[in-house]
A protein has these predicted regions:
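Flavin-dependent oxidoreductase catalytic cores
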Residues: 1-339
Length: 339
């Protein structure tokens, strides 16, 4: 069974600069869908400039991009979907019912939608009652399994089952877990066995071993969404889509070279579009929060990247890093998000 891979939406990380660079250097048709970081509809019924820049088809040429929307207002979802379809050519929209951010959840958005399943049901009912949505838009959902407990997850699955979702992407954690604690694989198993929609696995696939362990537990799952794992180790895609992921032999020297190419493409693009060098460097350091974990022999070089504030200093530190550091394939990675 061939595995299908999606790239997860990650705010500040998987914007169009990263998506395009990744597809050129590593993806090469291996990523079935790239999901945009969420669009948050506002009452003006207009997209922000940065949202337009990210969804613009000229910035997503040659890749299959799915726009993610975060709202708990069906009317806002519908006008956003209509505009995405009419003006930008998107026919698949993903609802964010998974973001654990406190500012999001306090507004009953993201994973906060799971707090009141009846309101989630009301939202989806209104969305699918709309003629335009039914006729033109494929709607998928990215969900968690609950807010503080998973006791309502069967009810949540029952609600999702009432509607013709394109697919259900399950991150098997509670909102209160954020991105820590063990995955709730029992809840994911429940989704696999009870969902009427196609179920996609999302969560903690950072290494080959992570992937093989999940695949062994859920052999019927053939579609996986990866985010942090592809930021940290872009070459992991070659392993997962291979005919035999367990025995696939990687060329880590080549992968390190390609990582440098990816980094440089993203950095150059961000320098071009962002207001000021400092902003672009800060964004790149967010990537290093993950990339640093797959290298050995590089503590001093990583420290120099952290300290750099100017473009010349940053580029010099990065060049030295890639000359010295050794790319390794680890069994487990525990991200601390500190850089």
């Amino acid at each position: 069974m061939k595995n299908t891979i999606y790239m997860a939406p990650m705010e500040g990380l998987t914007d169009f600069t990263f998506r395009n660079a990744y597809e050129k250097i590593f993806g090469k048709g291996k990523i079935a869908k790239y999901f945009t970081p969420f669009i948050s509809p506002n009452k003006s019924e207009k997209f922000l400039a940065r949202e337009i820049r990210d969804i613009d088809r000229e910035h997503n040429n040659g890749i299959n991009t799915v726009a993610q929307v975060m709202t708990n207002d069906a009317k806002d979802f519908i006008w956003t979907a209509r505009m995405l379809y009419d003006e930008y050519g998107y026919n698949e929209i993903n609802l964010n019912a998974g973001c654990p951010s406190g500012t999001v959840v306090s507004k009953n958005k993201g994973s906060g939608m799971l707090n009141e399943p009846k309101l989630l049901d009301k939202f989806l009912d209104a969305v699918f009652e709309d003629d335009f949505i039914r006729e033109n838009i494929k709607v998928s959902v990215k969900t968690r399994v609950g807010v503080e407990t998973d006791t309502a997850f069967p009810e949540i699955i029952d609600i999702y089952n009432k509607y013709p979702l394109e697919e259900l992407i399950v991150h098997p954690r509670l909102r209160t877990d954020f991105y820590k604690n063990d995955l709730n694989l029992e809840a994911y198993d429940y989704a696999v066995k009870n969902s009427r929609s196609k179920v996609v696995f999302n969560g903690d696939i950072f290494t080959r071993k992570n992937f093989l362990d999940i695949k062994k537990k859920f052999p019927q799952t053939d579609t996986f969404m990866l985010g942090r794992g592809l930021i940290a180790d872009p070459g992991l895609i070659d392993v997962i889509v291979s005919e035999n992921p367990e025995d696939f032999s990687r060329d880590l020297i080549s992968d390190k070279k390609r990582m440098k190419e990816l980094h440089d493409l993203v950095f150059d693009a961000r320098l071009h579009i962002m207001p000021g060098d400092t902003h672009a460097i800060h964004r790149m350091k967010e990537m290093w929060c993950y990339m640093a974990y797959v290298f050995d022999d590089c503590k001093k070089e990583i420290k120099a990247i952290k300290k750099s504030q100017k473009v010349a200093d940053y580029k010099s530190a990065v060049d030295i890093f890639f000359n010295v550091a050794k790319l390794t394939e680890k069994d487990y990675i525990l991200f601390s998000k500190k850089f």
